[in-house]
Amino acid sequence: MNFFMEKNKDAGHRVTIKIPKTTVNNSLFQEFIKIRKTTKINGFRKGKTPIRVIQEKYGSAIYYDIFKKLMQKFFYEFLKTEKIKIIGSPKFYIHQDEDKKKEYFEYSVIYELYPQFQIKDIKQIKVNKINVEITEEDIKKNIETNKNKKNIWNPVNKAVKSYDRVTINYCIYEKNKKIKKFDKDNISFIVSKNTLIPQLNYKIINHFVNDIIFFKIKFHAFHPEKELQNKDITFKIKIIKIEKKQELESEKSNKKNITEKKTIQTDYQTIKNNLHSQINIITDKYLENQIIQKIVEKNILLLPPLLFQKEIKNLYKQYTKQYQEENSNILEKKYHMSLDSEVKKRLYFQIIIEQIILNNKLFADENNIQKLIKKISSNYKNPMEIIKLYNKNKNLKNTMKNIELERQAMLLLKKSIKIEKQNWNFERFLNYNWASHEELMV
């Protein structure tokens, strides 16, 4: 196979490939023979039609299909030979065969390379590892907080304050024209403690029942509701009800008998274990985010536009599917946020981890994968069903393999960098704004 590589200023990378005419003609002939065996043409017995007749009848369509397959075959052989990793879908261009004497056909392919990346000064990176101390008093408070309590919401004739429960009706307008399909009634939420857009929370404060509030927001280009994308939308909100919370201990929690004390003693260790597990997950993620962020700061990592756009589309599909499955509200905050920062985080993590795997020639340890499967399956009612599913499902096997490789790569990174320990008490951990840390990760 002959090929010529070049780099275009605007169009990415290009390779010109030559396919011998004998290869094309042989492939065409084999296809004509297949058609002759399976197709009956008037005037000829099945399997006896002359190749010339089949060529006249089907030649153009078959030639295009054969050449398309050969172009893809030779291009991917070129990628394998040159050990090139591409992103996105390559674009194929057939050259005009002006010189009939040539012994080959020419075509070009434009493609985008997966980013080349070398990690430097890894030993100079410093990050913080948070160790959270949980005292007996912390666990007792947690048990007390989660005891059976009955929340009573009492209607009040007062201005809305934070942590009140508010019920609203709303409708929306674009350029003073109402979009009726998005009308919603009796939407209840706790002010300053919800997943809705911030504008709603601060606009509603200090208002009363029957007050009507207007505010305008620009919907994001990737909002799941296509009809609202990139549009300036005005919300008209009417407050229907304002309620304040009153906590009452249930009758069960008032009966401090011996059985309950035994239950609390049993729950103590379970709650302690659960708290440690949840804290470890959050602090490990915090540590890993710092590592990726520091590597990006010290090393130039350019994300190819094709790769970025591809990941944007994938994330948008996920968000849209989730939005539809959960029958979400258009006021949900996460659907009004830019996808760019989340996509950057994902791609930085993916590229860095893949580079670590490549540099260190890591391979998935089957014993560790089996341990992971057993751990995951233990969370289900029928663990054996999950294990059977894993053994049958190739996609699930690949997912588990990637998780194991990521674990090994991250472990290597943690061993290579400088980690400074920070000791926190449980209260500091609870009060830390973890969401803001995630938002700053770019």
UniProtKB/Swiss-Prot annotation:
Compartments, as annotated in UniProt: Cytoplasm
Catalytic activity: [protein]-peptidylproline (omega=180) = [protein]-peptidylproline (omega=0)
Entry-linked Gene3D superfamilies: 3.10.50.40, Trigger factor ribosome-binding domain, Trigger factor, C-terminal domain
NCBIfam families assigned: tig
Pfam families: Trigger_C, Trigger_N
Lineage of producing organism: Bacteria, Pseudomonadati, Pseudomonadota, Gammaproteobacteria, Enterobacterales
The record's note on its domains: Consists of 3 domains; the N-terminus binds the ribosome, the middle domain has PPIase activity, while the C-terminus has intrinsic chaperone activity on its own.
Enzyme Commission number(s) of this protein: 5.2.1.8
The protein's name in its UniProt record: Trigger factor
UniProt entry tagged with the keyword DNA-binding: no
Alphabetic keyword roster: Cell cycle, Cell division, Chaperone, Cytoplasm, Isomerase, Rotamase
SUPFAM superfamilies for this protein: FKBP-like (SSF54534), Triger factor/SurA peptide-binding domain-like (SSF109998), Trigger factor ribosome-binding domain (SSF102735)
Similarity comment text for this entry: Belongs to the FKBP-type PPIase family. Tig subfamily.
Domain PPIase FKBP-type: 163-248
GO biological process terms on file: cell division; protein folding; protein transport
InterPro entries for the chain: PPIase_dom_sf, Trig_fac, Trigger_fac_C, Trigger_fac_C_sf, Trigger_fac_ribosome-bd_bac, Trigger_fac_ribosome-bd_sf, Trigger_fact/SurA_dom_sf
Record function comment: Involved in protein export. Acts as a chaperone by maintaining the newly synthesized protein in an open conformation. Functions as a peptidyl-prolyl cis-trans isomerase.
